Curated annotation (Swiss-Prot):
Pathway: Amino-acid biosynthesis; L-isoleucine biosynthesis; L-isoleucine from 2-oxobutanoate: step 3/4; Amino-acid biosynthesis; L-valine biosynthesis; L-valine from pyruvate: step 3/4. This is Dihydroxy-acid dehydratase. Homodimer. The keyword Iron-sulfur applies.
């Protein structure tokens, strides 16, 4: 075992003394040492229930014959950090989390890992660490929140209802009482936000790839099932250690293709593009951005999930969950190992029934193509991403007038000031991985667009990214980003921009000679943040095209 490095031999007497100083008895020293990386915090609804799950994981590890050690990992809530300086830190924490898990596991020679996670950047950070370390690992996602409840059977979704309610209130569509009802009911308790936003999409994809146990991706945070899954995961990690089952045996090219297909079939968050690219890089799997678009043309969307549709995570779980989706996808799914021990197709075959109102058959899709499309053109030579499942038919093709803003705050001021009108294309730039820095989510501007009733007449493009709660004609991840001199930096007020999702085009309708002249006089702006962790991050982070990973190259 790896832990023998710190447990065996006379020269390890000091190491054993320190371990015994934590209370570990001699009788437990020959057992596998299992690290439980927990992202518990009482700052985030998605993580506030983890203390209970920690207990069940620990019981499972001891039942399976291992010895559990806990160590802490930070958690940032994208909802709380949205719309202010805090959002600069969200995506960078993914890299911090991966580095922290690696550091603790290597420094203490842990034999295996249980990765307790839930919210947006924490799950991909944990998976990046697992793939990088390649020691036996299993993921436990803490589960989604129940839908909020209102009068007359109304169900609330935190992301769509609260952010869009803010814009509707500002526009005079709803009053202060209705706004308050939304605020008080949108988050009824613990769990990740209720729709198919980034946290829940990543939980689903983690199960799809085989890195968590069946039902883990959809079982509600409040459920007894989630606790049983936590216990079983604790038992299972000891088995994985004894049989030397490692993440790279599971995180194969087939696993990533399955994850992308499930993402497309459900209309999941566009952030998964960044995260799957980053995880694949750590796993040594070649996964070009174009893969998402290739598979989107072959994979129909078969579920109408919130935010763009009517169903919540509790509906998906009851309707068949991840394995139900895999069963409906049928021959599109590739067989692959899982931490459970059964293969992907074996697990899918155990599903007895699927609620076809929630998870439709391939013969009756919601849309003929999957939920994410990748666009190219002179505005995005290295690609841009759109969640096409959230775009109305009227906006799949659109030509409009550029309204240029060099920050999210400037764009929000224009939106709330009534300066954006039908026919505009809102351009938010210098918000990419380097330029932001941190590639902030533009949920506030996109929710404001929808709340103001402009979702069918105004488009938004950015080198930043979007929340999983974003819907509407919103194009993100534009690469190269403005801070690197990408074409989005050359757009000027009044330019015409063409968005053509069916033909995968994003074009700036300006002569090349004019663009060359603009490029010749372009100079990079001063960094927005010059000190601290983010200043260092901006120097080593790469393009959205490669997953916005950090690199020393």
């Amino acid at each position: 075992m790896r832990s023998d490095t710190i447990k065996k031999g006379v020269e390890r007497t000091p190491h054993r003394a320190l371990i015994k100083g934590t209370g570990v008895p001699q009788s437990q020293m020959d057992k596998p040492f299992i690290g439980v990386a927990t992202s518990f915090t009482d700052l985030i609804p998605g993580h506030v229930g983890m203390r209970d799950l920690e207990r069940f994981i620990e019981k499972g590890i001891h039942s399976g014959g291992g010895y559990a050690f806990f160590f802490g990992i930070p958690g940032v809530c994208d909802g709380i950090s949205m719309g202010h300086k805090g959002m600069h830190y969200s995506l960078p924490t993914r890299e911090l989390i991966a580095d922290m898990v690696e550091s603790v596991a290597e420094a203490h020679r842990l034999d295996g890992l249980v990765l307790l996670t839930n919210c947006d950047k924490i799950t991909p950070g944990m998976l990046m660490a697992a793939a990088r370390l390649n020691i036996p690992s299993i993921v436990v996602t803490a589960g989604p929140m129940m839908a909020g409840r209102g009068t007359e059977g109304r169900r609330y979704s935190f992301v769509t209802d609260t952010f869009e309610a803010m814009a509707r209130y500002k526009a005079g569509v709803i009053d202060e009482r209705e706004l308050g009802v939304c605020e008080d009911n949108a988050c009824p308790g613990m769990g990740s936000c209720q729709g198919l936003f980034t946290a829940n999409t990543m939980a689903i994809l983690t199960e799809t790839m085989g890195m968590s146990l069946p039902r883990c991706g959809t079982a509600l945070a409040v459920s007894a099932l989630k606790r049983r899954i936590a216990f079983a995961s604790g038992e299972k990690i000891v088995d994985l250690v004894r049989n030397d089952i490692t993440p790279r045996q599971i995180l194969t090219r087939d696993a990533f293709e399955n994850a992308i297909r499930v993402d497309l079939a459900l209309g999941g968050s566009s952030n998964t593009v960044l995260h799957l690219l980053a995880i694949a890089r750590e796993a040594g799997v070649d996964l070009p951005l174009e893969t998402f678009d290739t598979l989107a043309k072959e994979t129909p969307q078969i579920s109408s999930m919130n935010p763009a549709g009517e169903y919540f995570m509790e509906d998906l779980d009851a309707g068949g969950g991840v394995m139900g989706v895999l069963r409906q996808l049928g021959s599109l799914v590739r067989d692959n190992p899982t931490v459970m021990g059964l293969s992907t197709l074996q697990l899918a075959s155990t599903v007895e029934s699927v609620d076809e109102r929630v998870i439709r058959p391939l013969s009756n899709p919601v849309k003929k193509e999957g939920g994410i499309a990748v666009l190219f053109g002179n505005l995005a030579p290295k690609g841009a991403v759109v969640k096409q499942s959230g775009v109305s038919d009227a906006m799949m093709t659109f030509e409009g007038t550029a309204r240029c803003f060099d920050s999210e705050e400037a764009a929000m001021a224009a939106l709330m000031g009534g300066r954006i009108v039908a026919g505009d294309v809102v351009v938010i730039r210098y918000e990419g991985p380097k330029g932001g820095p941190g590639m902030r989510e533009m949920l506030a501007p996109t929710a404001t667009l929808m709340g103001l009733g402009l979702g069918d007449s105004v488009a938004l493009i950015t080198d930043g990214r979007f929340s999983g709660g974003t819907r509407g004609p919103c194009i993100g991840h534009i690469s190269p980003e403005a801070a690197e001199g990408g074409p989005i930096a050359l757009v000027e007020e009044g330019d015409r921009i063409l968005l053509d999702i069916p033909n995968r085009r994003l074009e700036l309708l300006v002569d090349e000679a004019v663009l060359q002249e603009r490029r010749a006089r372009w100079t990079a702006p001063e960094p927005k943040i010059k000190t601290g962790w983010l200043a260092r991050y901006a120097k080593v982070v790469t393009s959205a095209y490669t997953g916005a990973v950090t690199s020393a190259d």
